Curated annotation (Swiss-Prot):
This is Probable manganese-dependent inorganic pyrophosphatase. It catalyses: diphosphate + H2O = 2 phosphate + H(+). PANTHER family: BNIP - RELATED (PTHR12112), MANGANESE-DEPENDENT INORGANIC PYROPHOSPHATASE-RELATED (PTHR12112:SF22). Binds 2 manganese ions per subunit. Its cofactor is Mn(2+). Belongs to the PPase class C family. Mn(2+) 2 binds at D15, D75, H97, D149. Its EC number is 3.6.1.1. It is an enzyme of class 3 (hydrolase). NCBIfam families: PRK05427.1. One of its GO terms (molecular function) is manganese ion binding. InterPro entries: DDH_dom, DHH_sf, DHHA2, DHHA2_dom_sf, Mn-dep_inorganic_PyrPase. Mn(2+) 1 binds at H9, D13, D75.
């Protein structure tokens, strides 16, 4: 049987890494012994905390050419967020919880997308539907992904299905959701030792919005001011990256995981449209967005609408 490559998006977060591992386990239980998890970037400290806690090894970094290779995508579908050779791959499955855009295949495929807070929640449902065993480490990764994507159930993207999945899994993983979740989020929230490049790339995605290409990065922190103390450096790097990658707009969303608010930093020719999107006036390229924590639900749709009016 040919190998099946399974991976999440570039600049992977906890859901992207965890869901690749989980999906590989799921596929192996179906009899696909060659299903193998990979990653499209470095493992962040939050994700590493989860992997270490449940004694799971991170997937290998994908360097292979995927031309004519069997592929399963998790936690994304847009080709610009995927492997560089994805257009030449044979995409077999997609399991995702995001919008569908810039995606097409030459052949039919299994596609499962649900409006829930986390890909791991969908995978949990798939295990239950098939009656597959959920091992403790798999349960732990599912919980970690759900907590990460939902900011410990505070994000507006979090659904009752996400909460129910985490509650059902906690006894298998042997964790207290609140205490484990807070420690995991804190592990990824410090920016003191991160370079400007790290901050901008650790959880960044590119989006085609009408005629514009927009880069939106997000960093979770317990101290927004700590990040914005380096605003000048951040802006310089954002402008350089935008020039090199031809981004029309670069938005950095700095999210306070304790108070559930965000402050944004915006550069690019279309930056005034961001002010329109959130009904705010940018002050020194920044704006405070109370209650905004979700890129998927509270940032991407709003900016898309402003850019495509």
């Amino acid at each position: 049987m040919a190998k099946t490559y399974i991976f999440g998006h570039k600049n992977p977060d906890t859901d992207a890494i965890s869901s690749a591992i989980i999906m590989a386990d799921f596929e192996q239980q179906t009899g696909n012994a060659e299903a193998t998890a990979y990653r499209l970037g470095e493992v962040g400290p939050e994700t590493q905390y989860a992997l270490d806690h449940f004694n799971v090894t991170a997937p290998e970094l994908l360097n292979d050419d995927l031309a004519d290779q069997n592929v399963i995508l998790v936690d994304h579908n847009e080709f610009q967020q995927s492997a560089d050779s994805i257009a030449d791959a044979a995409v077999q499955h997609v399991v995702d919880h995001h919008r569908i855009a810039n995606f097409e295949t030459a052949a039919p495929l299994y596609y499962r997308a649900e409006p829930v807070g986390c890909t791991a929640t969908i995978l949990y449902k798939m295990y239950k539907e098939r009656g597959f065993e959920i091992k403790p480490e798999i349960a732990g990764l599912m919980i970690s992904a759900i907590i990460s994507d939902s900011l410990l159930f505070k994000s507006p993207t979090c659904t009752e299905q996400d909460v129910q999945a985490a509650e059902a899994l906690k006894s298998i993983a042997n964790v207290d959701l609140e205490s484990y979740g807070l420690e995991m989020l804190k592990a990824g929230a410090s920016t003191k030792d991160k370079s400007v490049s790290d901050i901008l790339s650790m959880d960044a995605k590119s989006f085609n919005m009408g005629d514009f290409v927009t880069r939106i990065g997000q960093v979770n922190t317990v101290d927004i001011d700590e990040v914005f103390a380096r605003q000048e450096e951040l802006e310089k790097e954002m402008l350089e990256v935008s020039a090199n990658e031809k981004y029309d707009l670069f938005v950095l969303v700095v999210t306070d995981i304790i108070n559930s608010d965000s402050k944004i930093l915006v550069v690019g020719a279309e930056k005034d449209k961001v002010g329109v999107a959130f009904n705010v006036t940018l002050d020194n390229n920044t704006a405070f967005l109370p209650g905004v924590v979700s890129r998927k639900k509270q940032v991407v749709p709003q900016i898309t609408e402003a850019l495509t009016k």
